[in-house]
Amino acid sequence: MISSKGKYFFTSESVTEGHPDKVADQISDSILDAILAQDKDARVACETLVTTGMAFIAGEISTTGYADFQQIVRDTIREIGYVHSDMGFDADTCAVISSIDKQSVDIAQGVDRNTPESQGAGDQGMMFGFACKETEALMPAPIYYAHKLSRKLTEVRKDATLDYLRPDGKTEVAFEYLDGKPVRIADVVIAAQHDDGIEQGQIYEDIKREVVLASLPAEMIDDATKIYINTTGRFVIGGPMGDCGLTGRKIINDTYGGMGNHGGGAFSGKDPSKVDRSGAYMARYIAKNIVAAGLAERAEVQVAYAIGVAEPVSVLATSHGTGEVSDETLTKAVKEVFDLRPWYISERLDLRRPIYKPSACYGHFGRNNPNFTWERTDAVDDLRTACKI
């Protein structure tokens, strides 16, 4: 957690959908969605590795449905934009290899119960949720605007505004803070994959105009703001040809950009019985409602589970000193308002649906997507009542 006193800088990064790790995340979540569309009670843990000319799918899936892995992988890669062999990764010609087993019976016996309500957690672990008043989405400003840059970088590629761009890319935004509030953008960093033969000067001016200045709030940029674009001077080789990509390697990008804590669990490719995903979504939902209720400027929620046990082993809600009530009162209110057993989380947030592929890039939180139910603020009144405010 960052300080609430003095002047300091905080930086977060985002990546585009063509980044190799995000290619892997999107493939994993596309497979998850294909299965949940047929079998909402499926158990899915799907991992993906992508490298030059190959995608490898592995994991454990127990379902009554069927997923055409070959077609899903190729369609996902094509949609991202890897459609030419000179990129080293082509939707139509890459090898697709799969090795899928059923969910372990040892895990299944801890999750499955005679009644859905008593469903145990799919694993042990701790999950965190965070919210703050820095942006309208109640997200930290650095990650919020880093994602805006990444989305814009993809947009100007796909609509051919900058038709020489390729799918891979990364962004980074450093904010200057004063007494806990973001006051200006100090630095912007962008790496954008491009066709061979494009001059660095053109790339810099185009991206500065079409991406940076078009995405970031003008009042936060001043003459001292530094903008770095493709600082090696060349970014032609990228995507899975440039780096091997794996599911679950962008967990800070997926959450709060390093602000607040992270339990370590990844999201993509996991059905909601995995509390790595559903627990983190619920923690965000709670934290966002705490802030939206005016109970705190910042809120962080931790929930922890034991495998096979429905009730969490611990729950903590903290305002990091910004609250209208004590952390003890806040935590008690959270326990009163929210049922944190896995089945009830899935029911309250309606998670057993094919909604996950859009979450696999540009962040799981702070998004204006009606399917992202964990972004609703419909528990505000209940929390205020429980806190006796």
UniProtKB/Swiss-Prot annotation:
Gene: metK
Free-text function comment from the UniProt entry: Catalyzes the formation of S-adenosylmethionine (AdoMet) from methionine and ATP. The overall synthetic reaction is composed of two sequential steps, AdoMet formation and the subsequent tripolyphosphate hydrolysis which occurs prior to release of AdoMet from the enzyme.
Record key words, sorted: ATP-binding, Cytoplasm, Magnesium, Metal-binding, Nucleotide-binding, One-carbon metabolism, Potassium, Transferase
Binding annotation for ATP: H19, D168, G169, K170, R234, F235, D243, R249, K250, A266, K270
Quaternary context: Homotetramer; dimer of dimers.
Name of this chain's protein: S-adenosylmethionine synthase
Entry's Gene Ontology cellular component terms: cytoplasm
Localization: Cytoplasm
Cross-referenced NCBIfam families: metK
EC number: 2.5.1.6
Protein's organism: Maridesulfovibrio salexigens (strain ATCC 14822 / DSM 2638 / NCIMB 8403 / VKM B-1763)
Broad class of the protein's primary localization: cytoplasm
Highest taxon, organism lineage: Bacteria
Family: Belongs to the AdoMet synthase family.
UniProt cofactor(s): Mg(2+); K(+)
